[in-house]
A protein has these predicted regions:
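Protease-domain processing segments flanking chymotrypsin-fold serine proteases, especially trypsin-like
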Residues: 2-9, 13-14, 18-102, 109-120, ...
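Extracytoplasmic
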Residues: 70-72, 96-98, 122-124, 141, ...
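C-terminal subregion of chymotrypsin/trypsin-like serine protease catalytic domains
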Residues: 23-29, 37, 75, 88-128, ...
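Short loop segments at secondary-structure junctions
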Residues: 80-81, 166-170, 222-223, 299-301
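Chymotrypsin/trypsin-fold serine protease catalytic domain
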Residues: 161, 167, 173-282
């Protein structure tokens, strides 16, 4: 079995054809064999698709149900020892090698009732492989080891990446998914590039999905996403700030100067370790239960590469489900972590 899943350096140009995702059949699972199918990465003629504005529509909330056998690298993290169902599935993941699953660190590093952070016991979870339905089909594989990024903290979402080592290879048909190197990532992360997110997360109305759902969105400029979030925060913060300015009798010029200073010091919600994907039209993003799952980019030759991991999105103001007016979600930028991923796999044979 190969120990490294780093793709070759790609010499790429964005394709401007805007081929429609809806016309392409999702990949169909077949016997994976003993080796991860990463050989396609050697081609220097790969190109990421550019999304047409009218294509950048659905999200997993309200997205369409994926066909049986589609997205054969998608796995579900489920509670061990319990019947598989939408209630026992809590996160997603992707097979990057025969016995290695890529997921989000926040899926396996949680807080207890007292607010103390802990790593989930590998024996407490299993990995469901080879099915798009949470109905008892597929192969439930035990977990041998869980390794989160050492810089991840439960109090924020930076470095939100983890690897899960399976106790054995799955016994059902599956495929693994390629991840990009840094050079390819620069191309994939261009605004307008088509992305596809899959998962069993919450749908409209807060209902859990028992079937894997797929949705097409697109890459958005991270700085624009940060600006949008900062403006939303500023609208709320400005209400209290204007009152404080009155109390302290600040002149208009002093108040504006102080406000600009505060805004300049505010940390950007999305770091360079994150990808922004969605649509500024709103209401099209991933949700709870999709966490840890893959954000993939379709390439012009019909193959796919995983650019991101579902990390976080905007919560509905009601506290239930996800924000229906949210325009985007944050995804872990996998390319930034390939050296760490390879190191973990090589040192944990």
């Amino acid at each position: 079995m190969r120990k490294s899943f780093l793709s070759s350096t790609f010499v790429l140009a964005l394709a401007m054809s805007g081929a429609a995702f809806a016309e392409d059949a999702p990949p169909v699972a077949e016997d994976a064999g003993a080796t991860s199918p990463f050989e396609f990465a050697a081609s220097g003629e790969k190109a990421a698709r550019n999304a047409k504005p009218e294509e950048a529509g659905a999200k997993v909330i309200g997205g369409e149900v994926a066909a049986d056998g589609a997205w054969p690298w998608q796995v579900a993290l489920v509670v061990a020892g319990q019947p598989v169902s939408a209630d026992t599935q809590f996160c997603g993941g992707s097979l990057v090698l025969d016995t290695w699953v890529l997921t989000a660190a926040h899926c396996i590093h949680m807080a207890d009732d007292q607010g103390e952070w802990f790593d989930v016991d590998p024996k407490a979870i299993s990995i469901l492989v080879g099915t798009n339905k949470l109905d008892g089909t597929g192969d439930v594989v035990p977990v041998e080891k869980i390794i989160k990024h050492p810089s991840y903290s439960g109090t924020q979402f930076d470095y939100d990446i983890a690897l899960i080592k399976l106790a054995r290879a799955p016994t059902v048909p599956y495929k693994t998914i390629e991840v990009p190197d840094a050079n390819f990532s620069q191309v994939l992360n261009q605004p307008g590039v088509t992305t596809i997110v899959t998962g069993w997360g919450l749908q409209n109305g807060g209902k859990l999905s028992p079937e894997l759902r797929q949705a097409q969105i697109q890459m958005l400029d991270r700085n624009l996403c940060n600006t949008a979030m900062m403006e939303a925060r500023a609208d709320e913060a400005a209400k209290g700030f204007s009152y404080a300015a009155e109390v302290f009798a600040l002149t208009e010029a002093d108040a504006y100067a102080l406000w600009d200073e505060l805004v300049a010091k505010a940390p950007m919600p999305m770091s360079e370790n994150m990808i922004c994907s969605g649509t500024f039209e709103g209401g099209k993003t991933s949700c709870n239960g999709d966490s840890g799952g893959p954000l993939v980019v379709p390439l012009e030759d019909g193959t796919y590469i995983q650019a991101g991991i579902v990390s976080w999105g905007l919560t509905a103001t009601s506290g239930h489900g996800c924000e229906e007016t949210a325009t985007f979600s944050a995804y872990t930028n996998i390319a930034n972590f390939v050296p760490w991923l390879n190191e973990v796999i090589e040192t944990n044979p």
